[in-house]
Amino acid sequence: MTNIRKSHPLMKIVNHSLIDLPAPSNISAWWNFGSLLGLCLGIQIITGLFLAMHYTSDTLTAFSSVTHICRDVNYGWIIRYLHANGASMFFICLFLHVGRGIYYGSYTYSETWNIGILLLFAVMATAFMGYVLPWGQMSFWGATVITNLLSAIPYIGTDLVQWIWGGFSVDKATLTRFFAFHFILPFIIAALVMVHLLFLHETGSNNPTGIISDADKIPFHPYYTIKDALGFLLLTALLLTLVLFSPDLLGDPDNYTPANPLNTPPHIKPEWYFLFAYAILRSIPNKLGGVLALVLSIAILAVMPLLHTSKQRSMMFRPISQCLFWVLVADLLTLTWIGGQPVEHPFIIIGQLASFLYFSLILILMPTCSLIENKLLKW
């Protein structure tokens, strides 16, 4: 008799994805972030569901409903902080996951990579709308500033912004629709994750060497299930440490002040994980140019498979490319720092140089460097 996990229609899918899946024998801890992202999504959906049971999406009661969750609901405070800090963990894992893809050349699986970029956009949209829901000062002004950027689109811009707002300013209609979208998007993300995995399992995983590993595969279970379980344990420990010891470390104090359309905060800035893109947006003096740069800062990832000029897939044996990769990492950290600073000298010029370097590295320096390394192979 055939084993039920190999014959049952539903169990068969799970078996081929998580148990009998042939995996490269040498994938490192950098390959753990895919499963960690799945864990983050699960945590966000569960905590978000419980928060939605007590939250009211009305401008008059939204702020006090969040206060009510923290003060009166059983363990409401931990659910709220798990959700808020879970988003930070989500983005840490996302950035590391994308960084791994760039370093080891995983972007050459272009379908998987492109679905990943769509996922990144979807998660960023979800996080932005979620930040608006508590209806604090930074929620309101963040929503006003970011949605206002769409007015830079020629001809239809102003109408588009008012259509999104549902009126002539960010108000009750905006909050209600943002709540609706914030609730539905994680389920769309979950569906996209399935497509992402479908395409990944068509080709199989890449590995640190970038060399085809068909000759040396091991079953996913027990080797990588145990490895993922360790990752889960470490991520959960880190998240709980953050939630239980310094839950407001990554938040903005302004968001503990109820939204007031008549009082603008001195420094409007998004959550830390958007600061790099915000710095790129601010580095361009023109409004439309800034919006384009903002979108391109993520969309530029889509051209990476086209700009892969190296004869080797991974950067493991390419020291010059490795240097440029770490310059890119340092540049993104610089942009993140600049995004949180006021718009004044010397931060303006640092932001402009860092933005220029970001696009130059991806579009010009890294592909050129790969060509030089190809020449060095022949020496």
Swiss-Prot record:
UniProt cofactor note: Binds 2 heme b groups non-covalently.
Main location: mitochondrion
Pfam families for this protein: Cytochrom_B_C, Cytochrome_B
Any one Gene Ontology cellular component term annotated for this protein: respiratory chain complex III
Binding site for heme b b562: 83, 182
Transmembrane segments: 33-53, 77-98, 113-133, 178-198, 226-246, 288-308, 320-340, 347-367
Binding site for a ubiquinone: 201
Leftover remarks: Heme 1 (or BL or b562) is low-potential and absorbs at about 562 nm, and heme 2 (or BH or b566) is high-potential and absorbs at about 566 nm.
Assembly with partners or alone: The cytochrome bc1 complex contains 11 subunits: 3 respiratory subunits (MT-CYB, CYC1 and UQCRFS1), 2 core proteins (UQCRC1 and UQCRC2) and 6 low-molecular weight proteins (UQCRH/QCR6, UQCRB/QCR7, UQCRQ/QCR8, UQCR10/QCR9, UQCR11/QCR10 and a cleavage product of UQCRFS1). This cytochrome bc1 complex then forms a dimer.
Protein name: Cytochrome b
Annotated source species: Ochotona nubrica (Nubra pika)
Lineage: Eukaryota, Metazoa, Chordata, Craniata, Vertebrata
